[in-house]
């Protein structure tokens, strides 16, 4: 199935401890159906010091399920994403406004 949410999309969290927060997707794992969103679902990870990195308690963005994310449209509201054909090209569009997301 085609990816409705992609890297770089601005999304809002629908459920969980960060409900209502917005952020940009930094990576998507389609196999597990999860995405990493900047500044969302932060966990503290203890890491050992190495020659290149400082050790200690480092905040890290953890994956969040794609079903708990919604695309943010031009109005700043959460919307579902659909697909339609424009000419011979398949494009994503916001279902609330009908605007094409990626032309």
UniProtKB/Swiss-Prot annotation:
SMART domains (alphabetical): KOW
Keyword line: Ribonucleoprotein, Ribosomal protein, RNA-binding, rRNA-binding
UniProt keyword Ribonucleoprotein present: yes
Pfam family, one: ribosomal_L24
InterPro entries for the chain: KOW (IPR005824), Rib_uL2_dom2 (IPR014722), Ribosomal_uL24 (IPR003256), Ribosomal_uL24_CS (IPR005825), Ribosomal_uL24_KOW (IPR041988), Translation_prot_SH3-like_sf (IPR008991)
Keyword rRNA-binding listed: yes
BP-aspect Gene Ontology terms: translation
PROSITE patterns given in the database record: RIBOSOMAL_L24 (PS01108)
MF (Gene Ontology): rRNA binding; structural constituent of ribosome
This protein's GO CC annotations: ribonucleoprotein complex; ribosome
Function of the molecule: One of two assembly initiator proteins, it binds directly to the 5'-end of the 23S rRNA, where it nucleates assembly of the 50S subunit.
Quaternary context: Part of the 50S ribosomal subunit.
Family: Belongs to the universal ribosomal protein uL24 family.
Protein name: Large ribosomal subunit protein uL24
Lineage, broadest ranks: Bacteria, Pseudomonadati, Pseudomonadota, Alphaproteobacteria, Rhodobacterales
